[in-house]
């Protein structure tokens, strides 16, 4: 991604751009990916993404001059979008956890690992625990994707996504195959 999109003029939080994979939805998972940025602005991962107003995100930024009127970098954050609820101020996020003074290193590969299990979220950066949060606002399965803010060149590689949502054994493939065998294969 190299569009260098910031968001709306009125944004005091980094909105930028989002790209999501829409062929499948996930609830619980472990996602690992390598990220490389030519710029020092915001980037991260979104999950349980329903739309621009309902999702979670891991977001990190180096730049101390962005966003305008917002919190200065460097930092890493775990956030929940406040959604469409009555009385919610939009387009704001609620911060679940922050690691101030740390982000990524511009021009160097960074490895992220996001573990999402129910209402608990853990982020590791380069093999070290960075953020931890808990929230139950969005419980349903949603899309997973990337979010960028004012970046002029970001690359993601070596993506591994492991679905950890428990399978109902009554409808699992092996159970279903066992039932078919019982019904249709003579003893």
Each model region followed by its residue ranges:
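Secretory/extracellular carbohydrate-interaction modules
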Residues: 5, 9-87
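Beta-strand-rich interaction surfaces with strong enrichment in secreted/lumenal proteins
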Residues: 17-24, 97-104, 145-146
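Ligand-recognition surfaces built from glycine- and aromatic
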Residues: 137-186
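Short, aromatic/His-centered strand-loop micro-motif at the edge of beta-sheets
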Residues: 85-113
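Short tryptophan-centered beta-strand motifs in secreted/extracellular beta-sheet-rich domains
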Residues: 31-33, 105-125
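Beta-strand signatures of extracellular beta-sandwich domains
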Residues: 44-46, 122-124, 160
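Surface-exposed coil/turn segments at beta-strand junctions on protein surfaces, enriched
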Residues: 21-26, 38, 104-107, 116, ...
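Short, solvent-exposed beta-strand-to-loop segments that form ligand-recognition rims
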Residues: 119, 124-147
């Amino acid at each position: 991604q190299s569009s260098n999109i910031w968001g709306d003029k009125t944004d005091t939080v980094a909105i930028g751009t989002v790209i999501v994979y829409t062929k499948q939805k996930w609830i619980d998972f472990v996602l690992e990916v390598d990220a490389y940025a030519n710029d020092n602005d915001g980037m991260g991962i979104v999950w349980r993404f329903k739309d621009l107003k309902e999702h979670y995100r891991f977001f990190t930024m180096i730049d101390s001059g962005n966003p305008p009127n917002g919190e200065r970098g460097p930092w890493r954050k775990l956030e929940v979008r406040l959604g469409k609820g009555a009385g919610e101020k939009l387009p704001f996020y609620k911060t679940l956890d922050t690691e101030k003074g740390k982000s990524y290193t511009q021009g160097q590969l960074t490895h992220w690992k996001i573990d999402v299990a129910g209402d608990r979220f853990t982020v590791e950066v380069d093999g070290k625990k960075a953020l931890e949060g808990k929230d139950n606002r969005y419980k349903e399965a949603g899309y997973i994707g990337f979010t960028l803010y004012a970046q002029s060149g970001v690359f993601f590689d070596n993506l591994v996504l492991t679905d950890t949502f428990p399978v109902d054994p009554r409808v699992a493939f092996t159970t279903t195959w066992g039932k078919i065998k019982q019904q249709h294969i003579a003893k």
